[in-house]
Amino acid sequence: MARIAGVDLPKKKRIEYGLTYIYGIGLFTSRKILDKVGISYNKRVHELSEDEAAAIRKEIQENYMVEGDLRKQVAMDIKALMDLGSFRGLRHRKGLPVRGQKTKTNARTRKGKRKTVGAKS
């Protein structure tokens, strides 16, 4: 099993899809990396030689922000929005949808379980 950027890639998958298991790498980026390194998309992860795996590791390490670093950067960006007091930051702080969705009836994922208000018995 190839280990790239701290992630064990599934052995039987094609390398172009295997790389998408790394946080921050989608299909487009995966193909871009493989083109640059010169590896066929159809090659399976378990068929990679150690040199090819090292080349992929080097390409990702030098040119892409992935896994922990990317997660940390995203968290810092959200924290900066909250500290600024911007509208988006306030929505993050309140746990509401940030991108303009309506909240009267939907938004259950962000708002959580329903809280009944004013139920009289």
UniProtKB/Swiss-Prot annotation:
Residues 95-121 are annotated as: Disordered. It comes from the Bacteria. GO terms for biological process: translation. PROSITE patterns: RIBOSOMAL_S13_1, RIBOSOMAL_S13_2. InterPro entries: Rbsml_uS13_C, Ribosomal_uS13, Ribosomal_uS13-like_H2TH, Ribosomal_uS13_bac-type, Ribosomal_uS13_CS. One of its GO terms (molecular function) is rRNA binding. GO terms for cellular component: cytosol; small ribosomal subunit. Keywords: Ribonucleoprotein, Ribosomal protein, RNA-binding, rRNA-binding, tRNA-binding. SUPFAM superfamilies: S13-like H2TH domain (SSF46946). Pfam families: Ribosomal_S13. Part of the 30S ribosomal subunit. Forms a loose heterodimer with protein S19. Forms two bridges to the 50S subunit in the 70S ribosome. Located at the top of the head of the 30S subunit, it contacts several helices of the 16S rRNA. In the 70S ribosome it contacts the 23S rRNA (bridge B1a) and protein L5 of the 50S subunit (bridge B1b), connecting the 2 subunits; these bridges are implicated in subunit movement. Contacts the tRNAs in the A and P-sites. Belongs to the universal ribosomal protein uS13 family. PANTHER family: 30S RIBOSOMAL PROTEIN S13/40S RIBOSOMAL PROTEIN S18, SMALL RIBOSOMAL SUBUNIT PROTEIN US13M. HAMAP family: Ribosomal_uS13 (MF_01315). This is Small ribosomal subunit protein uS13. It comes from Campylobacter jejuni subsp. jejuni serotype O:23/36 (strain 81-176).
